[in-house]
Amino acid sequence: MDYAKELLEQSGWKDTDGDGIREKDGNKLAFHLMYFAGDSMRQAVAMSVANQAKENLGFDITVEGVSEDDTIKRMFSEPMIMGWGSDSPMTSYMLFHSSNAGKTDWYNPEFYMSDKTDEYLDKAMNSLTIEDSYEWWQKAQWDGETGTSMKGEAPWAFFVNMTHLYYVKDGLNIGNQRIHAHGQAWPLIANLAEWSWE
């Protein structure tokens, strides 16, 4: 938070009237944050982001539930709480490769484009083994100068990692579980062949 406050101060966003909201050149640091109407989880995340950003940084964020049709009209110019999750790095390719910029499939609505990131993502996708691809996926995130992570250009701000909770019958061993991505297939049973009764 200290770094964010420092950046805001350096760029001229200050609370000069004492109302808790930063302003610059007479404009309040205020905007809408959309989420899909009817999605209580994303609504809760949006409200939490708005409350914490106001309390800690001086943002005035209005949370707004919108329809999919409204989202398509506004997603290229206004922030939106989205939900992503995958156990495949292909999601990174879809989110950050310039070939996906501006499509209405929800992957790259911010029109993120970077020749360097494209180069790394293409090298990762063309690697002969998953192990060979790791270097390129990581460099796409941060290569020491640029990338898609918070150290770099951060076209996406990732706020939450969901934790999954399962009840398992006594005596059932479900083996070593991999990371369970948000809303993606059935990761719980991906290792079903390893399950056993004890």
Where are the regions that the model predicts?
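Ligand/substrate-recognition segments at binding pockets and active sites
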Residues: 14-86, 164
